[in-house]
């Protein structure tokens, strides 16, 4: 009976089901019971918990009988589960912080609503001013629907009547203060109308007589309440737009500022000096009604103060030091030169670039726009050009890394990237996409004409190539073919100093190519000896001359430290292709030099040290006779003697006729 075979032949129906009694029910706590089966053979307990554990019943909506075949007791329902405790009540919201009335007024209009096409800006007492002819009108009348490009608010400001005269008066009285008397008057009058101080970047409203602090937002509150959008920085003379929330650049305003400063400095340098300046100010006051003493409500502006600031007469906005990020002096000196080219300055500060790249963060022209804004922001702390360096590494991989690089190589690389990223800004008007007229080509691109003359038939083959700079060989024992250099002394005489003009003459001389470099003539169709001559077919606006001071002859590498003199003014007429053609035709040369061939020295980049270990610095001209020395983060005023005695590696000349415009 205990064997496996006997257990398989047994039938469960032969075992009678005992009736439930109190003996075969086992208590399981909480009043629930479980039926206990009678003792049966071990072979029949195939469903015992020791052999096969009982499956856990699936949860159902209602409990059913747990007996087999409808026999047995129903299990009582389980006790109801306790409901979860309610979540804690959230803490009450903090009370709103009480703000000042000025703060609420400055944040009230987050999105400007529709504005009228024209509006009139009045002075603080809402009175009207009269011109010198007696006609009554507002101080400035602004039309907000003008100006499609650049800052539309500046364009609207220029629509107003007498805006040039009023702006010129502000520059004369409050910005270009050249004499002790004018500086004294400025220290007394130019104070904040709200806090009565002059230390927090004082700005003057261009639409009325109001001075306010920029740091403490007093000028912002005035602009918010009066809708006067433009103000001028009294320290640097730059214009701030409250609608654009940035400093803006305008060519017409810049011209007025420059003319006013030149006029004042010219009067101060005259023999009469202060008297001429005072006479000018008196005449301007008679013609204009824009004066701090004209209104009773603004008499607080002219109260004398014990403390007053000192104002230097040199205008140095734009000259800002650049941090050296690790052997990046070659980049810093090129950036200082590029940011002071007048046409580039006008282009980038006027926001004329239209980025067409899918990733504007990789556009070098967009980064240069931000760099120009940082250089002309008036901030005197050195700028960190890390983003510019990163983009150069991306687009010019041969310059990646913190190794020492060549400044001339970096100049060509950055001009090439700027040219590629700004092609959409200046396509030729005729629709020829092959003829690029971008800002880089417009300023730097010239053309070299190469003439190959056959020695047999005298046929000339001409090739014209564009160029961004001109590399000039230096005289000396390291230059091929210079054994009889003009630097050698003869008969005990002192050697003559080589100039930039001598290098240009050597560059444009006819060169015999020799028998080892025979070229097939296009006319006689035979390989013959020929001569080669380079001339300038087209002159650029900014001419860059590269003095080749680094030479590699076999395994030898050396730097040529020969002194090369360079003039402040340069005439490029003798080196033009048209001049050569006139000489060959026997035509007389005119004594009058065309204005487009005259150049003025604009910047000089110097290399100090050896070929293996060196450093780059630059001299940059701001005005006619004002030169500054830029050595990474240090910018100082330089003398003409320091400039002309420098060694010279890259020389930048600007066309005089365009520079004067």
Swiss-Prot record:
The keyword ATP-binding does not apply. Residues 1-144 are annotated as: Disordered. Zn(2+) 1 binds at residues 151, 153, 241, 244. Signal peptide: none annotated. CDD domains: Peptidase_C19D (cd02660). Its EC number is 3.4.19.12. GO terms for cellular component: chromosome. The keyword Transcription regulation does not apply. This is Ubiquitin carboxyl-terminal hydrolase 51. It comes from Mus musculus (Mouse).
């Amino acid at each position: 009976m205990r064997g496996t075979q006997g257990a398989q032949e047994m039938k469960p129906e032969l075992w009678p089901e005992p009736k439930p009694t109190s003996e075969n029910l086992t208590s399981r706590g909480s009043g629930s019971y479980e039926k206990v089966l009678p003792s049966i053979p071990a072979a029949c307990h195939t469903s015992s918990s020791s052999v096969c554990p009982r499956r856990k019943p699936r949860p159902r909506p209602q409990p059913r009988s747990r007996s087999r075949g409808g026999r047995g007791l129903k299990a009582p329902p389980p006790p109801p589960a306790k409901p979860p405790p309610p979540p804690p009540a959230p803490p009450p919201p903090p009370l709103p912080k009480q703000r000042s009335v000025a703060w609420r007024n400055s944040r009230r209009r987050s999105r400007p609503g529709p504005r009228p096409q024209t509006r009139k800006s009045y002075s603080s007492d809402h009175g009207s001013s009269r011109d010198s002819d007696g006609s009554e009108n507002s101080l400035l009348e602004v039309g907000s629907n003008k100006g499609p490009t650049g800052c539309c608010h500046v364009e609207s400001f220029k629509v107003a009547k007498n805006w040039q005269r009023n702006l010129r008066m502000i520059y004369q009285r409050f910005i270009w203060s050249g004499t002790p008397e004018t500086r004294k008057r400025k220290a007394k009058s130019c104070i904040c109308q709200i806090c009565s101080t002059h230390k927090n970047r004082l700005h003057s409203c261009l639409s009325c007589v109001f001075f306010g602090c920029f740091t403490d937002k007093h000028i912002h509150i005035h602009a918010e309440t009066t809708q006067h959008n433009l103000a001028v920085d009294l320290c640097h003379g730059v214009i701030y737009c409250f609608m654009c929330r940035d400093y803006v650049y305008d060519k017409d305003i810049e011209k007025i500022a420059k003319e006013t400063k030149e006029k004042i400095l010219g009067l101060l340098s005259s023999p009469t000096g202060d008297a001429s300046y005072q006479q000018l100010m008196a005449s301007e006051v008679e013609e204009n009604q824009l004066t701090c003493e004209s209104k009773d409500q603004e008499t607080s502006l002219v109260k004398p103060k014990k403390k007053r600031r000192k104002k230097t007469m040199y205008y140095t906005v734009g000259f800002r030091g650049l941090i050296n990020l690790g052997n990046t002096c070659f980049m810093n000196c090129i950036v200082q030169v590029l940011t002071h080219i007048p046409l580039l300055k006008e282009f980038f500060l006027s926001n004329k670039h239209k980025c067409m790249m899918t990733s504007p963060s990789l556009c070098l022209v967009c980064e240069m726009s931000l760099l120009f804004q940082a250089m002309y922001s008036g901030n005197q702390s050195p700028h960190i050009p890390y983003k510019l360096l990163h983009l150069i590494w991306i687009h010019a991989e041969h310059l990646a890394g913190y190794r020492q690089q060549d400044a001339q190589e970096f100049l060509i690389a950055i001009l090439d990237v700027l040219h590629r990223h700004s092609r959409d800004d200046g396509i030729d008007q005729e629709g020829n996409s092959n003829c690029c007229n971008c800002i880089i080509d417009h300023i730097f691109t010239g053309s070299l004409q190469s003439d190959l003359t056959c020695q047999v038939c005298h046929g000339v083959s001409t090739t014209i190539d564009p160029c961004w700079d001109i590399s000039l060989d230096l005289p000396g024992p390291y230059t091929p073919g210079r054994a009889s250099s003009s630097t050698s002394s003869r008969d005990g005489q002192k050697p003559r100093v080589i100039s930039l003009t001598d290098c240009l003459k050597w560059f444009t001389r006819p060169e015999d190519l020799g028998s080892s470099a025979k070229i097939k003539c296009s006319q006689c169709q035979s390989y013959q000896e020929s001569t080669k001559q380079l001339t300038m077919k087209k002159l650029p606006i900014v001419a860059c001359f590269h003095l080749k001071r680094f030479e590699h002859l076999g395994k030898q590498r050396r730097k040529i430290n020969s002194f090369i003199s360079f003039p402040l003014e340069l005439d490029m007429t003798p080196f033009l292709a048209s001049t050569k053609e006139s000489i060959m035709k026997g035509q007389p040369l005119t004594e009058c030099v065309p204005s487009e061939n005259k150049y003025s020295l604009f910047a000089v980049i110097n290399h100090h040290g050896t070929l293996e270990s060196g450093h780059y610095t630059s001299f940059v001209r701001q005005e006619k006779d004002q030169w500054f020395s830029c050595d990474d983060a240090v910018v100082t005023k330089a003398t003409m003697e320091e400039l002309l005695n420098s060694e010279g590696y890259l020389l930048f000349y600007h066309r005089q006729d365009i520079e004067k415009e």
